[in-house]
Structures are given as structure tokens and as C-alpha cells.
Amino acid sequence: MSHFKNYQISHDILRALEGLGYTEPTKVQQSVIPAALERKDLVVKSQTGSGKTASFGIPLCELANWDENKPQALILTPTRELAVQVKEDITNIGRFKRIKATAVFGKSSFDKQKAELKQKSHIVVGTPGRVLDHIEKGTLPLDRLSYLVIDEADEMLNMGFIEQVEAIIKHLPTERTTMLFSATLPQDIEKLSRQYMQNPEHIEVKAAGLTTRNIEHAVIQVREENKFSLLKDVLMTENPDSCIIFCRTKEHVNQLTDELDDLGYPCDKIHGGMIQEDRFDVMNEFKRGEYRYLVATDVAARGIDIENISLVINYDLPLEKESYVHRTGRTGRAGNKGKAISFVTAFEKRFLADIEEYIGFEIQKIEAPSQEEVARKKPEFLAKLNDRPESKKDKSEELNKDIMKLYFNGGKKKKIRAVDFVGTIAKIDGVSADDIGIITIMDNASYVEILNGKGPHVLKVMKNTTVKGKQLKVNKANK
């Protein structure tokens, strides 16, 4: 049996993987991790939900030099949600090595990101537009950059970001390792790899066609005006613990969410017209299981790693065949079984034919639930509707439960460095350097993570201990 211990990975990274519940590597991880550790250029064709973030995150954290303050790796993602997700994953994987990851994306304070990039940032994750902005303004130093990851490259192409990606690449050092990940490999992506990569190794992790065998696919034919009635019947008979309902437009999402809410269904929505903070809040609440139904546009179809979504409903069939793969890929993740049901009108039949040709099989046509079936399932559905959904455990919860972040009211302007905190805190009785996590030094403040449940002890001692001869105020950090 393959195990992460078989790779050239340090104890700090292995310890974090164990805390995250990673036991054996997925297929893509088995192929990518050894090659990435050898600093090979890679073109990886792999489905969503295959564990690919960890496949590049683990080697990047392993290869990063903690003592180097400037960014050593840049990860480009098509969406803000994915940038935040990848940053969190990198932070968790590199927790005990004190790897600092920074996320930069649009519709968020440029100055705040600029200030964060001035601190030690080993790995930067961002969307192409904002990354290019930082590069052109000189706020993202590139002279120590050794690794570039282009994630969800086909989605970059669909969203019109490839020119920005190329502009970014032209600013980067030519001596670097480049890894490109994509669910599909259109011609333009192949061209990008030929132009900017050095003899890349091609890795393809085959599933049963373009969509995993863990997903049961079905189609129900329906008139547009009968869709909502059908949705109610399907939700009642399927009675999922966790479900995403996809619509084509934000207007449709808003309308459908209001209608479900009026019926008392525990639901929320996510689409591109919402402000960033609201989108993040909605996704986090859905991850935690605070409601069962998420109504969404394609903005939620990529990059959000939520296990145990049992049902995806295409209320509106996607007009682009790639979107079908990415939407339905939200279920059947991490080895779990899932189901994808698509509502198809007469107008949408031609798009269904394109999808079936693309995924390589005919999707099973099923009848709408009968009224007898709906009546039979109704009591069970209503009983679950009145129960609060069971809160889901975030995979990083176990890893982070013994971590306390401390705030100190001094930083660069007081000539304080990360090593000063390490030297001072490691001298406390019962505390070692292994108990110190990520350290962030700002102009007038510093944040230090204390690991292994030793935060309260360190907080108490540091109230009366100087750092580099300076007595700093210390409190448990709010963020």
C-alpha cells in the first residue's frame, strides 16, 4: 500500500497530513508528488475532487525554504473562492513547518494585500488579474520565485484569463519549475504548455471517462413551467443530506432561493453578483452543514472542496459541456457515492446530446417521481426538514484545535523579527520550537501561532517576558 511516508517528505509535513486525516495518497498524488519533488515540469490531466491541491501543495511546502522571506511559489487560480481554498490547504499542510501562504484576488483591499506581501510569504495564491496588478505595481517580488502552478487551466481559458496568465509568465524567472493542472486539455492549453514549459512530463489520471464512476447520472424531461414542482418532488423523494442546485443565471438563483425559503427549506445561495465576504460566509456555512440546499451559478462549480455532497441537481442544464463535468464533480468526491439529476426541457435537448458525446456515455432517462412515491416519502422528508442538519467536521478542525494565535503590539518598527519570537518562546519551560507555528510580523503588530495546546501557558508567561529587551502587550488574537 502506498503511503506518504514513502516519499521524501519531512516529519513536519507528515505530521500535518496525519492531523488532516490524509492516510494514503490518491492516484494523482501518487503520480505528481514524486515528480514535483524532483522539480520536474508537469502537465497533469486530472478530474476535480481527485486530491490534486495536495498533490502540488505537499511538494511546494516541502521544497519551500522557511528562512527565505520572499515568495518562492506562485499558484494561479481562476476564482477567488478557489484561491482562498488553496491558501487554506497550503497553510494546513505547511502548519508545522511554519509555511506562510498569502491569497491575493480582486474585489478585496489591494493595500491590505500589499502589506501582507511585505511580510514573509513563502507561497502566493491568486487570481490572474490581481496577481498581474501586484507584479506591475512592484508589490509582488519575483526574484526568488522557483515554482509556478497553474490550477484549473481549462477554466482559466473559459473565463478569458489566458492572456493575463501569459503576461504573468513573461515576468517570471525563466529558471523555474512549472506545473499545469486541468480537467481537460484544449488546444490552447497544450500550446501554453509547449511555449512556457521545459520538456514537461504528462500525467493523466484516468477515471471512467470524464466523470467518475462514483456518480450516478440521470435526466428527467420537463416543461420549463413545471420545473419548480418537479424540484420539490425530487428533493422529497431523494431527501439528500447535502445538495447543490445549479441555475444558469443569478436572477434564477435569487428567485429559486426565495421560493425554497418560503417553503421552510434550509437553503442559501451563491452567485457572482454577491459581495466577496457573503460568498465566503455562505460556502463556510454550507461546509459546516448549517443548511442542506445551496442554490448556485457556476461560480460554485469549481474548486470548492466539500465532501459528502450527496446530490447535485442541474435545475438549468449547462449550455457548455465542460460545465456539466465540473458541476456534477461536486458530488462523488473522495471515494463517496453521489448522484446528479438534470432537468431537461425540449430547448435543452441539443445541449444534452453534446454533453453525452463529451462524457462518452448516454445519461439514463428516468421518470419524474410519482405522486404515490412522493406521498410515501413525505413523512421522512418532513422529519428531516425539522431536524437541524448535523454539523460537518472540517478536515482541518482536528489539526487546528490545539492552536492559539497570540497578538503582540510590536513588529518591524521595533526591529523585531520572527527569530526573536522563536528564541524567546522556545526558552519557556515545557515549550520548544516545535510548539511555534506561523509567525507574521507587521509594522506595529505581530501574530504568533502556538501549537499543541500550549497557547494558554505561553500567553501567561509572555505577559511578563520581554522580546528583544522590549516588553510587549500580548493577548489572544481575534483573527
Curated annotation (Swiss-Prot):
Taxonomically, the superkingdom here is Bacteria
Give the UniProt entry's GO cellular component terms.
cytosol
- Cite the InterPro entries for this sequence: DbpA/CsdA_RNA-bd_dom, DEAD/DEAH_box_helicase_dom, DEAD_box_RNA_helicase, DEAD_helicase_DbpA, Helicase_ATP-bd, Helicase_C-like, Nucleotide-bd_a/b_plait_sf, P-loop_NTPase
Activity regulation comment = ATPase activity is stimulated by interaction with RNA.
Q: Quick check: keyword Repeat in the entry?
A: no
Q: Which PROSITE patterns match?
A: DEAD_ATP_HELICASE, HELICASE_ATP_BIND_1, HELICASE_CTER, Q_MOTIF
Disruption-associated phenotype: No visible effect at 37 or 16 degrees Celsius; no change in ribosome profiles. A quadruple disruption of all RNA helicases (cshA, cshB, deaD, yfmL) is not lethal at 37 degrees Celsius, although both 50S and 70S ribosomes are decreased, while growth stops at 16 degrees.
| Induction comment | In rich medium highest expression in exponential growth, expression decreases in stationary phase (at protein level).
Q: Which GO terms describe its biological process?
A: response to cold; ribosomal large subunit assembly
Q: What is the effect of changing K52Q?
A: Still adopts a closed conformation upon binding of ATP and RNA, but lacks ATPase and RNA unwinding activities
Intervals of motif DEAD box: 151-154
Q: Where is this region: Involved in 23S rRNA binding?
A: 404-479
Q: What does this protein do?
A: DEAD-box RNA helicase involved in the assembly of the 50S ribosomal subunit. Has an RNA-dependent ATPase activity, which is specific for 23S rRNA, and a 3' to 5' RNA helicase activity that uses the energy of ATP hydrolysis to destabilize and unwind short rRNA duplexes.
The family line of this record is:
Belongs to the DEAD box helicase family. DbpA subfamily.
Provide the domain comment. Contains an N-terminal domain that binds non-specifically to RNA and a C-terminal domain that binds specifically and tightly to hairpin 92 of 23S rRNA. Undergoes a conformation change in the helicase core upon binding of RNA and ATP.
Protein name (Swiss-Prot/TrEMBL) = ATP-dependent RNA helicase DbpA
Q: Which gene encodes it?
A: dbpA
